[in-house]
């Protein structure tokens, strides 16, 4: 029998196919631009996004929305799978600057998950049980999480960390999306994550639900 995960994947594929069909019918108007940026943009790599933008008529490519999206896609390419990570240095709960580089270069860490989230983001908090399960299982085997919060309220940020038992590394500028890391990693929305290996290379992106546990399990078994 079909599992829930398989069913969900089938529905997601069907939805993406339908979205692409509607997108192809609306490349000459702003509805098509909205579909690409808000529906498909989150799933595509930087290069795939540039390829989609190139299919729009020249006059549509001059619109503010597509110009912004193209700039974002060009930045995304810098953090695609296979690219080196971009360093981040932000304050932890004690106000001490903690750099992503120091975590990645720590010999004890074979893989580091750079996780962008916020306490007000429902889907982010929905991922917490999966993050906890993976962290608890693999933290002593070389897996670490570097969480970057896009909260604007320090109390909300640290309260969520404590109440949900998120026992990994946390940093935040407490400025919402007005965060240098959001620009460097071309974050379109959250939750968003990047898996970095011990050499500092991005090896996976946006691992959700059980996919994170399965990926770490597979990598650490090698």
Spans of features found by a protein language model:
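Thiol/disulfide oxidoreductase modules built on the thioredoxin-like
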Residues: 166, 173-221
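Extracytoplasmic/secreted envelope proteins and their assembly/folding machinery
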Residues: 50-53, 132, 154, 158, ...
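Conserved redox-active cysteine motifs that mediate thiol-disulfide chemistry
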Residues: 116-133
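Oxidative protein folding and maturation machinery
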Residues: 1-103, 108-109
